[in-house]
Amino acid sequence: FWFDFYKILKAVLQNFALFFGLNVLGILLAACISKVFCRFVTAAELVVLLTLYVQGNFLVNHMPPFDGTEIVWEDYRGENIKTAIVCILIAAAVVTVAKLLGAKRFQGICMAVSAGLSGILMITLVTMTVTTGAYRERTTYYALENGQYRLSQDQNFLVLLLDAVDAKTFEEVMDSDPAYTETFADFTYYPDMVGAYPWTAFSVPYILSGKWYEGEEYYLDYAAAAVDESGLFRELSERDYDIALYESDPWVTSYTYQFSNMVELQHEAYVWKYFRRAICKLGGIRYAPFFLKEYCYRAIVQTQGQHNAFVDESNPLYTWDLKEFATHMQEEEVTYQEGKCFRYYHLQGGHVPFLYDADLNTVGDSSYTETLEANIRVIGQFLDKLKQSDLYDNSVIIVMADHGFDPQNEVSAYDRQNPLFLVKGVGESHPLQTSLVPAAYEDLQDAYVRLMDGAAGDAIFPYQELSLIHISE
């Protein structure tokens, strides 16, 4: 999300003031009608409070995914039944206690329960805020779209990172059409590559830095340290490469190395009241009963729609969308600059939802294999653009994934440790070849240096003498 702790805090306090005022007004109106009705309203509020608390803390094991997968809400009818049962049981308990204890004692219990739950939630909030460092103001850098094809006639180091692409599935797609195999002529394919993390937030900083996330520090501290301590960035800087990261996720919080396409931006909501409503819905994702969660889940998109980043419309923020990347590729001319260039492009790859067919038409209900075909065609266009500009031979090119993917279980963290990895060194010319080297992302930092030194794609990992190279015809 683009917003920070202080924008959330401001919206939450305003929402709290609004709901608190409405609640006080409602209780006063109920008291004016009759004492019995006021007690009924108080009891109903207690039932709602306890139901939401149980929903948000004990009925969260079967939440719909947040990764863009299309949610079939009909599949969650069972969760609605659980919520209804909890609500009925709590209501029955409240009515029973009210009858047993009497009106005055029951009113005291309502106040005690409300204060107790409020205290628990407040302690949890403060603890999480302090331990995660969320309260600290940070500068986040965003990638602008232009300059993707401002490259060097000396040497380029280009990384195309495709999100969530499984090596074996990609290989099956390549084998299905000789044209796909021909796209990757001059490359070396590593089918036994072992990745690092199953999720993008951790794998991308690791790929670029070699620094593991041990869970002992706040994530943004880790991300900043990953940039600061990156062996790749240090080596590129020492060799005077111009470094640009085309990344749509705002995880870069350190500017130790000068990323030529990144800027610090001011952020604000377009219309504050709509943003405040969206923040309220975000809370409902966890605490609202399931029949309201579909409404609350829309807030994920709505908060992005309220993002005003104050950028020049002629140079918008970079997005990983595959079709937009292909469109921009056609629009931006290749230009040349002095010195060497490093360019990193994070693309949608095989991430859900599967929007495009093999011809990059928006269909909305495509398959994983069709999505991979679309990626291959876009990569082919990218490579052709380099060839037409006489920049292909002098470029190191890596086509890789941040992690693997299991199309049979899209939300599983398992079966994600075999990411795609294809590499071409400077000046290579041969059919697509396969290396059976037992390579791993743990070896990437040394591999990057070997590629900068002019090594071929089949000679960048240890144990090369144990490999068996197959040339794909």
Predicted regions and their residues:
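Transmembrane and membrane-interface helices of multi-pass
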Residues: 1-136
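Substrate-binding rim/cap in mid-to-C-terminal beta-strand-loop elements of soluble/periplasmic
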Residues: 192, 197-214, 408-455
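Metal-dependent active-site segment of extracytoplasmic phospho-/sulfohydrolases and closely related
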Residues: 158-159, 179, 374-415, 428, ...
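Active-site-proximal alpha/beta segments of enzymes that process anionic O-linked groups
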Residues: 31, 36-83, 90, 94, ...
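Short beta-strand segments
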Residues: 245-247, 342-349, 369-372, 396-401, ...
